[in-house]
Amino acid sequence: PATDLVVYHPYELSYYNRLVGGIRGAYQRGLEVTYFMEAFTPDFMDFLNKKLPQNSVINASFSNFMFEYYQEEGRLRQDFRITEKEDFDYYILLNRRSASSGVKRVLSREDLKTYASVQLTSVPLVLVYKTDTQNSKAGK
């Protein structure tokens, strides 16, 4: 129905029909809720550009290549460092279960705290975690 179009915009790729219970039902059943980086919207990039401190180090897991592309295109600030291996300030996770194999190890770190999220009807599409630098440095 037309109502669904309004609710899901701009996340149409996350659509599930009402037979499965919409996106909430799909999420509860373990189905994918994001696919092709569609949750990294211009609004989300604007949020990162405005809210993250200068020279922040970002690990976007399997999405790092997309963040590097956004930097090349001028959609993401150039002072951000995108990394996969070094210590990071922010961990950005696209909620794509099939591509999240190494993520549990990272998310089990005690120095990570939820900083922000992009949600669709209470289902997280993107999660942004911030490193608690005091705990992180104390543990080194």
Cite the ranges covered by each PLM segment.
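A short linear-motif detector with a strong N-terminal bias
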Residues: 37-38, 69-72, 106-109
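Membrane-proximal, lumen/periplasm-facing interface regions of secretory-pathway glyco-
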Residues: 1-46, 63-68
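Extracytoplasmic
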Residues: 50-91
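Generic, low-specificity signal for short hydrophobic/alpha-helical stretches with a mild N-terminal bias
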Residues: 26-30, 73, 111
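Surface-exposed alpha-helical segments enriched in charged/polar residues
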Residues: 46-50, 116
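Generic detector of short, locally flexible boundary/turn motifs and exposed helical patches
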Residues: 22-27, 56-61, 93-95
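Aromatic/acidic, Gly/Pro-rich catalytic loop(s) in extracytoplasmic/lumenal soluble domains
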Residues: 76-140
